[in-house]
Regions:
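Short, well-formed alpha-helical segments that are part of the catalytic scaffolds
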Residues: 8-27
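Short beta-strand/loop segment that forms part of the nucleotide-sugar
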Residues: 9, 30-38, 55, 84
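Acidic helix N-cap motif at the loop->helix transition within catalytic regions
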Residues: 16-19, 41-50, 91
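A conserved acidic beta->alpha catalytic loop
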Residues: 24, 36-45, 59, 83-86
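Conserved donor nucleotide-binding strand/loop of the catalytic core
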Residues: 45-65, 69, 73
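Catalytic-site signature of metal-activated, phosphate-bearing donor transferases
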Residues: 65-71, 89-216
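Short aromatic/hydrophobic "clamp" motif used to bind/position activated sugar donors
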Residues: 79
Length: 352
């Protein structure tokens, strides 16, 4: 089956990632467009071996301009946007075709799995991102952290599609800092030209996290949350959780407690419930912490892998162990399955 979908990518100095990315796409038989924005490594050479078309675009400090140029080069109206460090994990082509036939004016949301570490154990955070759309109705806007809008400037409806990507996302510390410094300049320009919005403040917060300036990240998240932000917005939900974890990292536990004031608005997410459990635990309010962690385990879905199961149970077990209630601790450590920190604690308790 060859679907009328063109994969459109922009790239610069991505020879560490682009080959794996393009190899994973090959079985799908999508048309592949690569637009290079000034590579000095082997990116173009590799792209020419795998892609159907390779173009050059003079970088102008505008991601949307580069993205929109890439989709103009496609042979198909349906375009799938991916980055070079995103590797295809799962796809159902029959369901994908059916979904596009039903949703011609909407944006398809892929699943992107992002690796991260917690308590020294590698885990996954999953998110839905709008990446598939018909170029007759939509395009990109925004010079940085570009977003999909309809051609008349509205936010399009969305639909879920059976496409999952793994986000490798590894960048050296120096490369991460260089990228964050560049992005900061573009984000501040966007803020000045377009005015404040939850989206821009959230991205500024994330950018300052990349620059290891958590105080600045907190400041921008606070500004975003003061804009009467929609609690049903995925960006706003992520901003609340980012804000909370930054406060915990900064040991500002008393300020983090203020998130109780918006509990009702955000309590539909396991991620927020788990965060509240962490906040109560850091403040020594252990009964409330256990209550929130237990509540998190009642949710069927979450963004950060394990917070509705083994991570929540591990924290409950840790609290019971610290309180000297070893039987309860053992019970909850066992609920963590093969989660390495829990297995280790069970062995240490048995040996004590």
């Amino acid at each position: 089956m060859m679907l009328p979908i063109s994969v459109c990518m922009i790239a610069k100095n991505e020879d560490n990632h682009i080959e794996e990315c393009l190899k994973r796409l090959k079985p799908c038989r999508f048309e592949v467009i690569v637009v290079d924005t000034g590579s000095v490594d082997r990116t173009v050479e590799i792209a020419q071996r795998y892609a159907d078309k390779v173009f050059h675009f003079a970088w102008c400090n505008d991601f949307s301009a580069a993205r929109n140029f890439s989709i103009q080069q496609a042979s198909n109206d349906w375009v799938l946007i991916i980055d070079c460090d995103e590797y295809l994990e799962n796809v159902n082509l029959a369901e994908l075709e059916e979904a596009t036939n039903r949703n011609s004016h909407s944006v398809g949301m892929i699943v992107r799995n992002n690796p991260y570490s917690i308590q020294g154990v590698r885990s996954i955070m999953s998110e839905r991102i709008g990446r598939l759309f018909n170029r007759r109705y939509c395009h990109f806007e925004g010079i940085i952290h570009e977003q999909v809008f309809t051609l008349d400037g509205r936010e399009p409806d969305s639909f879920q599609i059976p496409l999952t990507f793994y986000h490798e996302g590894y960048v050296s510390e120096s490369g991460k800092r260089m990228r964050a410094t560049r992005n900061l300049e573009l984000l501040l320009h966007d803020l000045e030209s377009k005015g404040p919005s939850p989206f821009i403040y959230y991205q500024l917060g994330q950018n300052y996290i990349s620059l290891n300036d958590l105080d600045k990240a907190v400041q921008y998240c606070q500004k975003g949350l003061k804009l009467n932000a929609d609690p049903n917005s995925a960006i706003v939900q992520s901003m609340v959780e980012t804000y909370g974890y930054c406060l915990l990292e900064l040991a500002k536990y008393d300020i983090a407690m203020e998130l109780q004031d918006i509990y009702t608005q955000f309590s539909q997410r396991a991620d927020f419930i788990y965060l509240m459990g962490m906040i109560y635990m850091k403040n020594g309010i252990y009964d409330k912490a256990i209550e929130e962690f237990r509540k998190a385990t009642t949710f069927s879905t979450c963004s950060r892998k394990g917070i509705n199961s083994y991570q929540a149970n591990y924290n409950i077990a840790s609290i019971y162990e610290n309180m000297g209630e070893l039987e309860e601790a053992r019970t909850y450590y066992k609920k963590c399955g093969d989660y390495a920190p829990a297995v280790r604690r069970l062995k240490e308790i048995a040996a004590s």
